[in-house]
Amino acid sequence: MFSHQDYLSFVNKKNKMNGIDLFKLIPDKAVKIAFFDPQYRGVLDKMSYGNEGKGRGKERAALPQMTDEIIQQFINEFERVLLPNGYLFLWVDKFHLVEGVKPWLENTPSLSVVDMLTWDKQKIGMGYRTRRRSEYLVVIQKEPKKAKITWTLHNIPDVWAEKLQSKPHTHSKPIEMQKQLILATTQEGDLILDPASGGYSVFECCKQTNRNFIGCDLIFGDDENEQD
């Protein structure tokens, strides 16, 4: 078992490991902000799309899925490792936006939803009625909640249009949107966490903004950084 002093050896690498194991390395109040894109089934279970296991549905279905209990476990750890005033950027789909994410926050009293952004992917996806063209980023802040001293850019709209130039991962996220959020809420050298990194877009943003990254993915990552 690793100890907290070992976590620096995992910084700025594509670690291939379970996110919960990564949390065990990180000491309390060490992370400035975090991104989390949980691999929940959500709308897929409700809609029962026929393309699951075929084409792009095959990629999505192959990813390990997180139960609500596992997601809550991650949220509990975010509360522990975030610095006071730190932000958690939580990606959700339309189903979880409508149903609400508050049950995931029941055991984390110092975390509060303070804002939300919509990512217009400029590409139409699935849907029996309206077709999916967007994803949602819930902005959660750790107490004490403050806006002016923790969010320094004020040109970020709450609807962000960005089409992916390439898609190395089935859940790829917008580089420029995430980069602007990093610039708004952190300083150079700060530590940024993504324990379900997927295509490692947050890592790329950190490299472009001179921030330190700590993150991992259970499936994706460099084999030389794989942890049992």
UniProtKB/Swiss-Prot annotation:
Biological processes annotated in GO:
DNA restriction-modification system; methylation
InterPro entries in the cross-refs:
DNA_methylase_N4/N6, N4/N6-MTase_EcoPI_Mod-like, SAM-dependent_MTases_sf
Which residue spans adopt a coiled-coil conformation according to this UniProt entry?
none
Q: What superkingdom does the record give?
A: Bacteria
Q: Which UniProt keywords apply?
A: DNA-binding, Methyltransferase, Restriction system, S-adenosyl-L-methionine, Transferase
Record EC number:
2.1.1.72
| Gene Ontology molecular function | DNA binding; N-methyltransferase activity; site-specific DNA-methyltransferase (adenine-specific) activity
- Please list the reactions this protein catalyses: a 2'-deoxyadenosine in DNA + S-adenosyl-L-methionine = an N(6)-methyl-2'-deoxyadenosine in DNA + S-adenosyl-L-homocysteine + H(+)
Family assignment?
A: Belongs to the N(4)/N(6)-methyltransferase family.
What protein name applies here? Type II methyltransferase M.HhaII
- Give the gene that encodes this protein: hhaIIM
